[in-house]
């Protein structure tokens, strides 16, 4: 009888441990996308606007705009095709020079007199082609870290992206498109004032050093391309998230803007599998997510 009780107790303890293990490995509760409103102090707010275009409002109220392809973007809500709808912008980040990422950055920079930052050497080319004036470019090095708002503000690090970065420019003298060097493609690790970290991956294929970058910076949220053709598709994006990065949250991006970008969020979630520990958040363009 004593032996039978011991066996039952051991089985119960094993079951309890398994339950506890399941709880610890469950996806983090996902914040729900919502319509935009006034900034909630202490929160990181992420507004995805289609493709890779993103507006991040930091807990301290700084507004960082990434890859603002808006006026020509079929996924951008009509309201945000008016660039003034972005509100005051404190910083523009560009991951690379392709038109669906460079987008409206020169117009926003010029109108608001806010600098364009790039970690891969694009800035001098923007100036030489007359897209912006030299005072509106703030280049920094790939793998470099900047703190443009001081030691207590957000911290931005440029990290590797496996992509290309041609800058296609229409020469006004010939009315023909020309292809120019656009610097190196990058992604950005953005650490907020409260320590919350976002990895905006820009355009990238799968590469093994995603694991090293994730171990070094430990991002809470990965904004990851899933459309395929030019970037990772759902399967590779799932490998990146599940096996290399392991963030608490993931927002899929860079899909659905052209027939070539066929990957979908549902395919991405299916590829991750039922045991994934990352909560996938799928906002509609123009919906804001607060963390």
UniProtKB/Swiss-Prot annotation:
Keyword Transcription (UniProt): no
Record GO terms (molecular function): hydrolase activity
Keywords, alphabetical: Hydrolase, Plasmid
Gene3D superfamilies: Ribonuclease Z/Hydroxyacylglutathione hydrolase-like
Record flagged with keyword Transferase: no
SUPFAM superfamilies linked to this entry: Metallo-hydrolase/oxidoreductase
Domain of life per record: Bacteria
Species in which this protein is naturally found: Cupriavidus metallidurans (strain ATCC 43123 / DSM 2839 / NBRC 102507 / CH34)
Protein name, entry field: UPF0173 metal-dependent hydrolase Rmet_5695
Pfam families (UniProt xref): Lactamase_B_2 (PF12706)
The family this protein is said to belong to: Belongs to the UPF0173 family.
